[in-house]
C-alpha cells in the first residue's frame, strides 16, 4: 500500500477544496484523498478503489472504526468495478518509469512512467459527468509534455492548480475537464470516443453511436453502429475543410459512394466507420479473380466521379483512400481534397495506380499490360468513352 507522501499532501489540498458531487478516488491507497473528499460539504457519495486487496481491507476497517457514511471501498483495476458516472475523479497514479530490477505497482507507471496514465485517459470520459472534473497529480519524471498530449488527444482540457519542486522532480496537480467539443459529441449520443489516426488536415476518432436514441420509437431495441469522427487539426491551415468534405460526402452518398454521412457541425463531421483493409493489404491476401472484380468495381466508382465532374485528387496513390470491406466491397474514403472540374481524372489516375502496383499484382498471378493500359487511359481522357474501361479490365492476363 502506498503511504501518503509529499505528492499525496499536494493533491489533498486541492481535493479538500474542489471535490463535489459523486466522487471516485482511483488508486486510493491509504484513502487520504477519499477522506479529504468526504470532508467537503459539496461532495456526496465517495467511492474509493484500488487494485491492492490489503489497501481496501485496511480502508474498510477504518471506515467501520470511524463509522463513516457515504463512502465505500472496493477492489478495482482502474474503472473495472466503478459503475456509473462521477462528478469528481481523483487520480494520483504511479508515475515513475519502470526500474527493471524492482516490481512495485504502487510507484511505477509503466516502461516510461506514463503508460498507466494513458490507460486512464483513454477510459475516463465514459465515467466523467459532462460538468465533472478530474484532479490529477503527476511528476516531471513522467514527462509533462506526454501527459498533456494524452489529455489533448482524448479531447480533454486542463489547467494547473498547484506545483511543488524538489531536488529530483517537480510535482503538478491539474484540473482536467471535458472540452466543449467532447461534451457536444457525447450529447449527440456518441460513446466510447477514442483517438484513431491523424491525417494532414484532420484527426480521426472512433465511437459507438446508439441510433435508437436519435429516433423516437415505441421499441427499446438498441442499434449501435461504429462511427468515425473527423475534426480539424489545431495546427492545420486549411480553410473550411470540414464544410468542404461534408459538401462532397452529401453528393457522393447520393450515388452510393463514400462512407455514409451521419451528422455534422461546423468543427466536426461524423460518418459510418468503414471496417476493412486498405487496398494493398487486401490484395496480398486475395486470389486473382477476386482482385480483378475489385479493380473493376473501383474503376466503376471512379467513372461515377468523373461523370459527376469531380476529382478526388488521390486516385493515383490511393493507399489510404480505398478500403475493402469484409464482404469484399471497395469503399472510397476521405473526400476533403475533392474539387469540381470539367476535366476529371479519377479513372485515368486509378489506371496509373494499377500500372504502379505491377509487382504486387504479378505476385498474385495477375499481369497487366502497362503500355496498353496507359494507351487506353489516354483514349478515355480524349474521348470520355466509357467502353474503354471494359477494355482496361480485359487487358489483365
Task: Go through each PLM region and give its residues.
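Mobile active-site "lid"/loop adjacent to the S-adenosyl-L-methionine
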Residues: 93-119
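ATP-binding glycine-rich loop module of kinase domains
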Residues: 194-242
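Protein kinase catalytic-loop region centered on the HRD/HxD motif
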Residues: 303-311
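Conserved structural core of kinase catalytic domains
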Residues: 260-294
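A conserved alpha-helical element in kinase catalytic cores
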Residues: 231-264, 293
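Conserved Class I SAM-dependent methyltransferase catalytic core
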Residues: 13, 116-173
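C-lobe/activation-segment region of protein kinase-like
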Residues: 329-397
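Conserved SAM/SAH cofactor-binding pocket of Class I
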Residues: 6-83, 88-91, 97-98
Amino acid at each position: 500500500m502506498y503511504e501518503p507522501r509529499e505528492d499525496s499532501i499536494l493533491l489533498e489540498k486541492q481535493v479538500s477544496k474542489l471535490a463535489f458531487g459523486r466522487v471516485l478516488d482511483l488508486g486510493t491507497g491509504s484513502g487520504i484523498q477519499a477522506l479529504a473528499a468526504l470532508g467537503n460539504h459539496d461532495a456526496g457519495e465517495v467511492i474509493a478503489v484500488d487494485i491492492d486487496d490489503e489497501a481496501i481491507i485496511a480502508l474498510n476497517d477504518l471506515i467501520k472504526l470511524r463509522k463513516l457514511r457515504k463512502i465505500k471501498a472496493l477492489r478495482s483495476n482502474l474503472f473495472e468495478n466503478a459503475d456509473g458516472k462521477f462528478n469528481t475523479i481523483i487520480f494520483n497514479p504511479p508515475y515513475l518509469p519502470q526500474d527493471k530490477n524492482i516490481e512495485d505497482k504502487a510507484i511505477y507507471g509503466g516502461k516510461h512512467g506514463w503508460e498507466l496514465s494513458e490507460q486512464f485517459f483513454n477510459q475516463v470520459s465514459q465515467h466523467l459527468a459532462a460538468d465533472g472534473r478530474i484532479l490529477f497529480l503527476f511528476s516531471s519524471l513522467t514527462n509533462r509534455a506526454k501527459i498533456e498530449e494524452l489529455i489533448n488527444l482524448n479531447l480533454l482540457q486542463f489547467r494547473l492548480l498547484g506545483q511543488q519542486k524538489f531536488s529530483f522532480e517537480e510535482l503538478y496537480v491539474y484540473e482536467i475537464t471535458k472540452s466543449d467539443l467532447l461534451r457536444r459529441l457525447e450529447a449527440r449520443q456518441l460513446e466510447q470516443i477514442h483517438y484513431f489516426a491523424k491525417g494532414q488536415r484532420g484527426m480521426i476518432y472512433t465511437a459507438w453511436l446508439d441510433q435508437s436514441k436519435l429516433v423516437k420509437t415505441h421499441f427499446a431495441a438498441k442499434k449501435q453502429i461504429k462511427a468515425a469522427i473527423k475534426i480539424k487539426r489545431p495546427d492545420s491551415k486549411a480553410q473550411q475543410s470540414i464544410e468542404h468534405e461534408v459538401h462532397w460526402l452529401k453528393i457522393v452518398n447520393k450515388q452510393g459512394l463514400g462512407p455514409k454521412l451521419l451528422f455534422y457541425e461546423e468543427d466536426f463531421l461524423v460518418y459510418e466507420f468503414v471496417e476493412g483493409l486498405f487496398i494493398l493489404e487486401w490484395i496480398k491476401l486475395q486470389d486473382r479473380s477476386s482482385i480483378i472484380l475489385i479493380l473493376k468495381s473501383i474503376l466503376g466508382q471512379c467513372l461515377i466521379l468523373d461523370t459527376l465532374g469531380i476529382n478526388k485528387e488521390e486516385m493515383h496513390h490511393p493507399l489510404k483512400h480505398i478500403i475493402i470491406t469484409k464482404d469484399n466491397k471497395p469503399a472510397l474514403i476521405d473526400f476533403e481534397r475533392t474539387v469540381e472540374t470539367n476535366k476529371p481524372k479519377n479513372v485515368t489516375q486509378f489506371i496509373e495506380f494499377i500500372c504502379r502496383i505491377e509487382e504486387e499484382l504479378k505476385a498474385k498471378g495477375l499481369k497487366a499490360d502497362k503500355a496498353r493500359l496507359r494507351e487506353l487511359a489516354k483514349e478515355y481522357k480524349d474521348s470520355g468513352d466509357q467502353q474503354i474501361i471494359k477494355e482496361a479490365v480485359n487487358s489483365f492476363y
